[in-house]
Amino acid sequence: MNILPKSIPIRIQSLRRYQGSLKTSLRALSTRPIFEKRLLAETPFSIRPSNASVLIAKRSPKFGWKQVRFYAANPNGGNFRMDLGGGRKQGAALEEYGTDLTALAKQGKLDPVIGREEEIQRTIQILSRRTKNNPALVGPAGVGKTAIMEGLASRIIRGEVPESMKDKRVIVLDLGALISGAKFRGDFEERLKSVLSDLEGAEGKVILFVDEMHLLLGFGKAEGSIDASNLLKPALARGKLHCCGATTLEEYRKYIEKDAALARRFQAVMVNEPSVADTISILRGLKERYEVHHGVRITDDALVTAATYSARYITDRFLPDKAIDLVDEACSSLRLQQESKPDELRRLDRQIMTIQIELESLRKETDTTSVERREKLESKLTDLKEEQDKLSAAWEEERKLLDSIKKAKTELEQARIELERTQREGNYARASELQYAIIPELERSVPKEEKTLEEKKPSMVHDSVTSDDIAVVVSRATGIPTTNLMRGERDKLLNMEQTIGKKIIGQDEALKAIADAVRLSRAGLQNTNRPLASFLFLGPTGVGKTALTKALAEFLFDTDKAMIRFDMSEFQEKHTIARLIGSPPGYIGYEESGELTEAVRRKPYAVLLFDELEKAHHDITNLLLQVLDEGFLTDSQGRKVDFRSTLIVMTSNLGSDILVADPSTTVTPKSRDAVMDVVQKYYPPEFLNRIDDQIVFNKLSEKNLEDIVNVRLDEVQQRLNDRRIILTVTEAARKWLAEKGYSPAYGARPLNRLIQKRILNTMAMKIIQGEIKSDENVVIDVLDGELEFKANKLEPQSTSHED
């Protein structure tokens, strides 16, 4: 029964309210029984209830149970630092932050290491020292520094090491795991300290390998506390820690040599790039692993091509890594082709689907035409399905053979790994069975199935990686044509002079020199240590020096925009050289790459044009000396840029006054000698001596100009095609243009201006006024010494023909 008046609850709600929490001491008392029970249950040593009260008072209210540190009485005396939930056992840090290479070697998961005998032996010698037994593998990225430690782990497993190195473990430190989650100051140092403690506790039985060691040594500096290098120094000096690091020469100089105390604790082992021959041996050793992984065959020609092409065309990386990447990518490309439907089957599927859709639309039609059409489609559909079934069966059969070969190779590899393991474990009964029964049977079955596949001559599936596949990968990555010449390309190269000669009139000598250089390159006979070719084009203005270079780029790449052009009038000052290779350190723009070096790095197969070279500063020629002779140029960042796949053209107007004064339209020996005298006085001999050919262009004759008129009018017609306007120029008008546009001193440029002024400007006005419309034929003739324009409506067949 409610005895309170109804007004009291309303009154209470109107009063001021206070909210808050219990005091810390009260909250501690309320949680005390729970905490005492948990603490006594999880502490790995005996603790008195009286101490539990002290522990509760010492805990920080800011953190949860896992982050709170407690101090309890150690039964042996003194204080013992502990984490709630139990202490860390010996070696736990190495398990958490490391990967055991020797365990992976036992399982056969490491690739075989070919060569590197000297580097591995040197590493073992340093590890066997009493103090400062810490090798540092120093070398460029991709030369195989990590592989040396994998080779050491494999040798330890096989027992191919000195007695003092047997039964040791090689553990790779995982820097990502070591850093991740270290949110609070001191967390990283504590983790590293636990790793070092585990290593010292292993008593020399563990070799710690730190890949990218310069990253580890720099950690901790940002927090202002003791960094990793200072934690490592005492252990490294005492010899209690077997640590092997790997880094590049640049990072070694930047992070380790700068600290003399740290540098003297490591012994550098230089790991140089292997030769092409050594790389081929490495690829042959890895061949079986990649065949098993991808399920394809790799020919020996493909391995040789991968090593030679990677050394020749991929210059910004190092062997053997870049060669292995070529083989791996070629294998993956072939594997995708095998797992996808062949093009013939996909084409049949599309045809069948199209017919089925059409049949569905004709299903309810009853007229005679529709019925006949339906019968024809049904007959065609039956034939296509029969062909589809036949091809599908052949494809499935070929795929089954390939899968069978892949399965046999996988079983053979697993059997060999098991044989090594059983021999180590002393299980000689199983080892005997593997060595004399299982492995020989598998070794016989693999060639047998491969022979069966070859006899069937598979047409649907390509089963082998060849040198052509490697060449395709190189071409795709660099843009450099390395594939074998196809029939159409052969004909194109053989007729190169005639093709370019349709646009460049009257310069047969220059065309021949350019065509010979390109053919030499595509045949693979050019000097591999120089650019494809280098030319100096000399002659008066307007004779086609720049136009020939544009036509060459269009011939090679189907667009004249593939040419990299530098107008040398922009480089008249000495400081503008920095624009080509990048600014030196300390100057504005140092981080930006040079215009020349960056363009060639991005497009190594290109036509380089240095237009009007004589207008540039003389130091530009000194810069080009190395490019013309060695095919390399070093930019401001220290990167070597490869120019060996470029074709370099330099144009100049030096001596043009001599050629203009000569009445002959072709270059006479006397004129040539006079021009070359001027050139030799202007450029140093070491520059001219490095150029492959110096070509003097002919003056344009009146007959040449008539041919150029036809070329220019064809270009005008290309612009009018979009408007469906046909341009018809009479023979009289063509001769009028050639006469009015001829100038021995200025070449073809006056003709271009004449066509612009007398034809294009007039037609533009008439189009805007509506006098010339689409689908009309514009006839240009000469009347009273001037050009006359007449527009006639096109016949329908003419319009369709032009379209």
Curated annotation (Swiss-Prot):
Q: Provide the leader sequence positions.
A: none
Q: Where is this region: NBD2?
A: 465-656
BP term (GO), one:
protein unfolding
Q: Which GO terms describe its molecular function?
A: ATP binding; ATP hydrolysis activity; unfolded protein binding
Q: Name one GO cellular component term.
A: cytoplasm
Q: Which residues form a coiled coil?
A: 343-431
Keywords from the UniProt entry: ATP-binding, Chaperone, Coiled coil, Mitochondrion, Nucleotide-binding, Repeat, Stress response, Transit peptide
A Pfam family this protein belongs to? ClpB_D2-small
Q: Which SMART domains does its entry note?
A: AAA, ClpB_D2-small
Q: Where is this region: NBD1?
A: 94-342
Tagged with keyword Signal:
no
Q: What is its main location?
A: mitochondrion
UniProt keyword Cytoplasm present? no
Q: Which PROSITE patterns match?
A: CLPAB_1 (PS00870), CLPAB_2 (PS00871)
Localization annotation: Mitochondrion matrix
- Give the transit peptide range: 1-36
The protein's matches in SUPFAM superfamilies, at most eight in alphabetical order, are given as:
P-loop containing nucleoside triphosphate hydrolases
Entry domain remark:
Has 2 AAA ATPase type nucleotide-binding domains (NBDs) per monomer. NBD1 is primarily responsible for ATP hydrolysis. NBD2 is crucial for oligomerization.
The Swiss-Prot or TrEMBL record describes its family as follows: Belongs to the ClpA/ClpB family.
* Summary of subunit composition and partner proteins: Homohexamer, forming a ring with a central pore.
Q: What is the protein's name according to its record?
A: Heat shock protein 78, mitochondrial
